[in-house]
């Protein structure tokens, strides 16, 4: 079952808030809900009914594979297009895929933090 835009965003928000030591807010613009771990961004949810996307960090080789596999996964909006991908509603974009993308992004960011700043194990 494909995740519609609002469900995609709600799923991403729920997945992010279930992770340890996550904060979120609107530091850039009122339309971008930004999720961070230890002050580092791992998820951006676009609050725009005409462009219901999420943007997550991704290993470059995995990002390329995802972009080839799904038409609604594109290089990351707003950020380094090599290390970030944006997911929009479309065929194959399931709640499980969204949750996995958010969790993978969190893990990528958390593992690069100095040991003292890393969240407790999840």
Enumerate the language-model features and the residues they cover:
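Charge-dense, helix-prone N-terminal extensions
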Residues: 1-122
């Amino acid at each position: 079952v494909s995740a519609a835009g609002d469900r995609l965003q709600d799923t991403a928000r729920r997945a992010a808030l279930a992770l340890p030591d996550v904060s979120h807010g609107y530091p850039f613009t009122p339309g971008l809900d930004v999720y961070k771990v230890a002050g580092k961004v791992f998820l951006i949810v676009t609050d725009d009914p005409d462009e219901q996307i999420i943007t997550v960090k991704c290993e470059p080789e995995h990002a390329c594979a995802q972009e080839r596999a799904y038409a609604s996964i594109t290089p990351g909006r707003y950020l380094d297009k090599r290390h970030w991908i944006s997911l929009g509603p479309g065929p194959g974009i399931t709640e499980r895929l969204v949750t996995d993308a958010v969790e993978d992004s969190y893990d990528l960011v958390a593992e690069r933090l100095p040991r003292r700043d890393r969240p407790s194990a999840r």
